[in-house]
Amino acid sequence: MTEKTSLSYKDAGVDIDAGNALVDRIKGVVKKTRRPEVMGGLGGFGALCALPQKYREPVLVSGTDGVGTKLRLAMDLQRHDTIGIDLVAMCVNDLVVQGAEPLFFLDYYATGKLDVDTASSVISGIAEGCLQSGCALVGGETAEMPGMYHGEDYDVAGFCVGVVEKSEIIDGTKVTDGDVLIALGSSGPHSNGYSLVRKILEVSGCDPQTTQLAGKPLADHLLAPTRIYVKSVLELIDKVDVHAIAHLTGGGFWENIPRVLPENTQAVIDESSWQWPEVFNWLQTAGNVSRHEMYRTFNCGVGMIIALPEAEVENALALLNANGEKAWKIGVIKASDAEQRVVIA
């Protein structure tokens, strides 16, 4: 009689010991993100977080996002240290445009075979993003799923919850004719348009690691972490009458700005007010991409656009630039019933 082989979970492709090693590796960086409202530590079935006491009528704001196919480029180039920052940025920037202070963040990391070094690098980046935005990394899920992903490929998703005073929610309803639009400079393509980026790299035959652009490898431009605007914008909201904020993500200028405009208003963008960073000029030229498509796919150097009264512009620019942002007047709001909500001229 043939003796049956005793199988283990590891034989099936799931290494519990590797998962435990990862938890031990990241405990220190996660602890640095802790906020006073967080109750308990890592390892519970759920994370507990109290609401900050300063809010009279707190409203919770939630968001979830990923980093799209920027992740594929990062895996191809074996550069995992900033993807976590991208993940946090995509979530917390969406929250702050509504006036919300990010409270806590959770991540989901899924892979076919867990590489502790890679996962630790990614999660350390997530912790860094949480530090930059002032939110606590309270938990997450690391899923090793053999057969679901090729080799050591992985995917990440983020989930964030923030809080805003009910009377201070920013929803665009205050936007009016004559408001001025202020731009906040981006750090690069952020985390959008990377399927087109990768297609341009493929068609052009360009090696981003050896191609030099503005004194550094193209890969550095393409993988620059998404800028986190939370602390600068929260201070701005506290001191200036902000009417609306648009986070320029997928859909670029054409789709994101109208999301915060009331009916019968139009955003007029002054294209001469800034110069595209070199990476966008390279992408347009290498891919023969139309101007319209560039503004539809990429942020073209603008990470956020803020609408506020003209009387607030000087103070707003001074505050933002003092906090390390590259801020400038990029346009105005005009009364219009035109179907085209955004004009770039």
From Swiss-Prot:
Protein family membership: Belongs to the AIR synthase family.
Pfam families: AIRS, AIRS_C
Alphabetical list of Gene3D superfamilies matching this protein: PurM-like C-terminal domain, PurM-like, N-terminal domain
NCBIfam families reported in the protein's UniProt record: purM (TIGR00878)
Pathway given in the UniProt record: Purine metabolism; IMP biosynthesis via de novo pathway; 5-amino-1-(5-phospho-D-ribosyl)imidazole from N(2)-formyl-N(1)-(5-phospho-D-ribosyl)glycinamide: step 2/2
PANTHER family: TRIFUNCTIONAL PURINE BIOSYNTHETIC PROTEIN ADENOSINE-3, TRIFUNCTIONAL PURINE BIOSYNTHETIC PROTEIN ADENOSINE-3-RELATED
UniProt entry keywords in alphabetical sequence: ATP-binding, Cytoplasm, Ligase, Nucleotide-binding, Purine biosynthesis
Catalytic activity: 2-formamido-N(1)-(5-O-phospho-beta-D-ribosyl)acetamidine + ATP = 5-amino-1-(5-phospho-beta-D-ribosyl)imidazole + ADP + phosphate + H(+)
Species lineage: Bacteria, Pseudomonadati, Pseudomonadota, Gammaproteobacteria, Enterobacterales
Subcellular location: Cytoplasm
Enzyme Commission code(s) on record: 6.3.3.1
Gene it is expressed from: purM
Entry's Gene Ontology cellular component terms: cytosol
Gene Ontology molecular function: any one: phosphoribosylformylglycinamidine cyclo-ligase activity
Main location: cytoplasm
Annotated GO biological process: 'de novo' IMP biosynthetic process; adenine biosynthetic process
Protein's name in the database: Phosphoribosylformylglycinamidine cyclo-ligase
EC category name: ligase
